[in-house]
Amino acid sequence: MGRIEAPLFLYMEFKQYCEGWKKLAKGMEKSLVSQLHDNKELFEEFVTEQLYSGVNGREEALRPRYSEDPYFQGFRDPKKASDAYKKWKMRIQPPARSYLGFQPRDADTPNLIIRGDFYASITAIPIADGLMIVSQGVSFSADIERKYGNVIYEIGNKAREHYVRHYMLPRIDKLIKECGL
């Protein structure tokens, strides 16, 4: 049997297609990291949204609960003090359903907000391969970190899914089109 030659135009289409994939592969990481940097405020919002819902970056309830918090052990009646604090917190910061899909926190679950100083201090800092989220500018953030762990700054699965669906996938679609694919 003889060899069948592919028409030149098919070869050219295939070559252009391969070049498009190479271009996409080369530019994808840089573009997605740049997008993270451009949306750093959104990641700060994700962290505060998680905290307001009473969960950390692993989507676990913040602990200690008010009824277990060592802070209230310094009061003459720790239960009465924690109950009064819970009641006050429910009045000034009532639980609400999250746009990320978290249920409202219960009355005994902290949300780490009183005046908003700590939430305002949550800062996403661009780094080479993404973002680093920290607290900057409040004197008591180290106390909060000791009590609740640095996991409070992590981005949970619900926030990641939201970001991928609403930001990353549209960017990838745009990149694919720009590469002629």
Name the predicted role of every residue range.
Residues 2-181:
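Short, Lys/Arg-rich flexible segments
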